[in-house]
């Protein structure tokens, strides 16, 4: 079995899609827009696990405080600086082991996103 997607329902749909496309670097692999329904699937490529973003204007700004999504990056320090320049408020860098460093940042919908360099 392979994981298909992680779904985020949000009132800030355009900002959310932009975050995962422009900051994380995912590509739109499928988009569905019919009437009031608007869904975008983003991933690293066809057949890969997707972030499914659903436009839900009544979703408010709250999200599951325990949800966290992690991405690997080649240079966590550089990405953290870029996010700060764009107005995001990333956590301090953490390094629980010599070959691992990471930080967290909230996406526009309030989901905690971790960017990890190194690791397993």
What are these model-predicted stretches?
Residues 1-2, 61-66, 96-97:
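Short glycine-enriched loop/turn motifs at secondary-structure junctions
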Residues 1-17, 67-71, 119:
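N-terminal beta-strand motif that seeds the catalytic metal site of vicinal oxygen chelate
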Residues 7-48:
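Core segments of cupin and vicinal oxygen chelate
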Residues 19, 77-82:
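Short amphipathic alpha-helices within nucleic acid-binding modules
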Residues 29, 80-120:
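Vicinal oxygen chelate
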Residues 38-40, 67, 99-103:
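Short beta-strand micro-motifs in enzyme catalytic cores
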Residues 47-51, 61, 110-113:
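Short, charged/polar, Gly/Pro-enriched secondary-structure boundary elements
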């Amino acid at each position: 079995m392979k994981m298909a997607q992680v779904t985020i329902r949000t009132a800030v749909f355009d900002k959310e899609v932009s975050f995962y496309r422009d900051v994380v670097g995912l590509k739109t692999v499928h988009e569905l827009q019919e009437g009031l329904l608007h869904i975008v699937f983003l991933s690293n490529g066809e057949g890969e696990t997707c972030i499914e973003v659903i436009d839900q204007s009544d979703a408010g700004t709250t999200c599951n405080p325990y949800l966290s999504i992690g991405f690997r990056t080649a240079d966590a320090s550089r990405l953290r600086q870029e996010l700060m320049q764009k107005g995001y408020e990333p956590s301090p860098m953490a390094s629980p082991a010599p070959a691992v460093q990471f930080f967290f940042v909230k996406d526009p919908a309030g989901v905690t996103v971790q960017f990890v360099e190194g690791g397993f």
